[in-house]
Amino acid sequence: HWQCRWFQSTELAVTPIGERPVLLFVDTFSRYFEPENLRSAQRVLSAAGFTPFAPLPDQRSTKPLCCGRTHLSVGNVARARDTAQRLVETYAPYAAAGIPIVGLEPSCLLALKDEIPALLNTQDAQQVAKMVLTFEELLLTEKTALCLKPLQAKALLHGHCHQKAFGV
């Protein structure tokens, strides 16, 4: 159902803590339109033994971090580059430290993995791209504290269009 309470930056730690930190990318769509998905992801990550955090951007702007994909989609390459650069500058130190970057919105994650490295053509953008995982990839590839058991029922899965297009 519709949530009218946006996801606030104060809902997550802003620096890595604990033995298994994971950077949770709070994308614009999830922040404003499906904040409960972020809150649920935070609970699942914590239950799995991770300590999710979301770093704040520098003080150049009060705007939350964004991948810039929407700017690219309307041909505003300069603004997309500036938006992406701000994100990469914030995430690069964590990527260099080997901290996974996990998110919920496949189109934004694929922008981080594919479009931003091509757009910025920097070592930092490449390093960030290497650490990006979907929420599902993190839970499937990392050892977790979750005790998941196979369901004895059929389930339908509707994949995101960007996941299908990129074979994820």
Residue ranges of model-derived segments:
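Iron-sulfur cluster-binding electron-transfer modules in prokaryotic oxidoreductases
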Residues: 1-168
